[in-house]
Amino acid sequence: MKIFRYITRNTTKQIPCFGIAITDESFIRFNDICENDISEKISIIDIISNPLLNDKITHILNSSQIDKIKTYKIADVQLLCPLDKISSLRDAYAFRQHVKTSRENRGLKMIREFDNFPVYYYSNHNAVSGPGLIEISKRFLEKLDYELEVAIIIGKKGINVTPSEADAYIYGFSIMNDFSSRKIQMEEMKLNLGPAKGKDFATTIGPYIVTKDELSDSIIKTENGNHYDIELSCTINNIKYSSDNLKNMHWTFSQIISQISKGTMLYPGDVIGSGTCGTGCFYEINSSKNISEHIWLNDGDKVNILTDKIGNLSNEIKII
């Protein structure tokens, strides 16, 4: 199931609604498939924390009933962040290549403690938006960067979750772009604290929440939890800069969930980012010997993150 949130274009009544993608071009309205089970003010947390509702939707999607439900064109609606409410936003540090190259960029060796346990930081869950135009203050423009990531959305409460139990806590996956002001970030982190203001202003997530059953054919089982064979790439103004695969995470989402939940409750709607994948940002790319001049994002740039399983997330930057 691919859930998204949208408003209808060219209408005066701009009320966000939920939809379920049937194909890459068409969708059904959430209210049409379960109008007797939801209220008009339903939130994404109400959906993901209700297993009976999800079972009903899955049954309808896989039955002949789906043929009786009217479909609409995705092109006729404006996609929003699929999460209207986010309980918390954490971002991990799970790709070895990104960590190693980013440290080399600062003249540092690979940190040995990276292999001890997964780490993460809290980001601003109130600064999250979805596909489309994203407004960013000019104070963050110097060395403005993108970050190619995948996020998981937690589906139920849990504490002290073991890696073997963790997969059951994942409701779905989405694309995440953690915009970063590298100049501010590097100044802050000289104090050995952060990221802080350098990553406090803009994150985009979307366009879909793809439930984990949709990715069953991408699973690579390991003793430390599942890896996922999902191709990731990013273009800026139609030029490809980033390419990696989600299976290259050093730490699995199961291990990350287990670490986060030690003595701390997980809640439905918690979002956890994978961290930046290899080559997944200009900060890493700029350290390449093949780059003669550093590249950063600018006003009007179009950032397009592409995957082969969970959709594409496109943003256009507007500096204000």
Predicted feature descriptions by range:
Residues 1-34, 197, 203, 207-210, ...:
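Charged, cofactor-coupling segments
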Residues 1-119, 302:
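N-terminal non-catalytic cap/leader segment that marks the start of a structured domain
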Residues 38-44, 250-262:
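Short, surface-exposed linear segments at secondary-structure transitions and domain or protein termini
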Residues 51, 77, 146-148, 228-230, ...:
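Residues at beta-strand starts and edge strands
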Residues 72-73, 132-134, 286-288:
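Short gly/ser/thr-rich secondary-structure transition/capping motifs
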Residues 83-257, 294-295:
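Glycine-enriched loop-and-adjacent helix/strand subsegments that border the catalytic/binding cleft
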Residues 257-268, 279:
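Extended, compositionally biased non-globular segments
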Residues 268-269, 300:
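Loop/turn positions that initiate beta-strands
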